[in-house]
Amino acid sequence: GQIVAAGDLQALASLGENPPAGARVRALAVAGAFHTSFMQPAVEPLRNLAATLSTHPVSINVISNKDGEVVSDGAEVLTRIVNQIANPVRWDLCMETMKSLGVTGVIELPPAGTLVGLLKRAASEIEGFALRSADDLPAAREFAERHL
């Protein structure tokens, strides 16, 4: 499995210098501390914006990154998206849900590659497609048609 640590740079450097036994620590190329408590100040403004939006019943089930649960209510999907920015992504639970639902293919949107790589290792029975640019759209369409 993979665990992502977030914190101030000095604390993360210390973790890198003294990793837990058997662990490998490396810095991730990210634009921000998304899905961590460092994003908490953004939750309320996003919640206020979300309150101005209308939701509708979803036409397909959504698997929540919070806990891998299937969500079918549009308002709940929006609430979970707002809260997700300051909470960990549980991709492991999402993959378990996809396996239990019989999902056969997943398209990862840009920037793509990380989740498909994890999928390949943890749920090899599910085929992954990393959509990296507009040039990949025809192949992504063919991929989707094979998995409908």
Where are these regions (language model features)?
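Acyl-group transfer acyltransferase/transacylase scaffold of fatty acid/polyketide systems
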Residues: 1-148
